[in-house]
Amino acid sequence: MSHQYVSRIIWTGNRGAGTSGYRSYDRSWDIAIAGKPVIHCSNDPLLGGDPARMNPEDLLLSALSACHMLWYLHYAAVDGIVVTRYEDIPMGMGEVGAGGAGRFTAAVLRPRIAVRHGSDIAAAHAIHGRIH
């Protein structure tokens, strides 16, 4: 079964002069997906972005964590393990090269999960290895 996802990425940082100079524009942009609220975003603050807005690295890290969580909950339900709480505080690492280009280098997921008393804890831990 194939899936298709469509979003619009709209640059909103034109201060009137476009990209006439490196500092003449903002790194702000919106994510617009039909039927959903618009998400106002920016670049990472280290690269000139607005620290009050989500940046690509925030979104990538959150998407990785959320996908892992949703698959974990799926496998837990299928395996009869009752999850009562799930929270993750993932951490992403990046670096800026000598030329100023940034890149995302790693992500570490750190989920904290509570299961119903009497659940098979070893089986609950093993679920993580089944998620790709």
Could you tell me what each predicted segment is?
Residues 64-68:
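Alpha-helical metal-binding/catalytic segments enriched in His/Glu/Asp
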Residues 1-62, 73-132:
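Extended beta-strand/beta-hairpin segments
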